[in-house]
Amino acid sequence: MVSLHDDERLDYLLAEDMKIIQSPTVFAFSLDAVLLSKFAYVPIQKGKIVDLCTGNGIVPLLLSTRSKADILGVEIQERLHDMAVRSVEYNKLDDQIQIIHDDLKNMPEKLGHNRYDVVTCNPPYFKTPKQTEQNMNEHLRIARHEIHCTLEDVISVSSKLLKQGGKAALVHRPGRLLEIFELMKAYQIEPKRVQFVYPKQGKEANTILVEGIKGGRPDLKILPPLFVYDEQNEYTKEIRTILYGDK
């Protein structure tokens, strides 16, 4: 039986018929991670996937419903790592998903170069120029701000881990899209697919999904936009399907 700590809860992933351990004081996944797990290419039958900055394991759990590939999640925060491990155990996915507690910058040396088919990441979004701009909760501060890893770290490590032709998928903020493109190209990952996510019609995009191929040829595709809320401030049909399935 998987135990919960005092500040933890067990949330349903309705579309996937799974449960995940969350904590309002430590970490709770956002819609961004769910969108990344639906956006990323994954091999259906076999292969090797790495999810960097895995948090409580939300992306590996969701990817396991789309792929039979071996999935590895990497998380630097010990408490989040523990939550992810217990969530994997609760869903009886130990044979497919492994969660390791380590710094993602160590992964090329530990896991080997050119060995993975897919790398996914929902990285910290914000640079950390001033202490006053950082969230005061340590767990959230590390998850949201580039304290232990930068965007360049994520992309350079992804490139080292990927096979030629392997795919890297990120979710991030639109303001850093050009930086993502520049870094991908610098590390031999060619941007291939981009999708802009909007809070609702008439608003600016607040999230981007980007996928690149290691050693790929230039041919960028802009996918149709994704709107989260309709005019009644309810989830759009597409988002409802992603979150709740076709029920």
Curated annotation (Swiss-Prot):
GO molecular function: methyltransferase activity
Name listed for the protein in its UniProt record: Probable RNA methyltransferase YabB
Role: Methylates cellular RNA.
Superkingdom in the source lineage: Bacteria
Family as reported in the entry's similarity comment: Belongs to the methyltransferase superfamily.
InterPro entries in the cross-refs: SAM-dependent_MTases_sf, Small_mtfrase_dom, tRNA_Adenine-N(6)_MTase
Pfam families associated with the record: MTS (PF05175)
Name of the gene this protein is made from: yabB
Entry-linked SUPFAM superfamilies: S-adenosyl-L-methionine-dependent methyltransferases
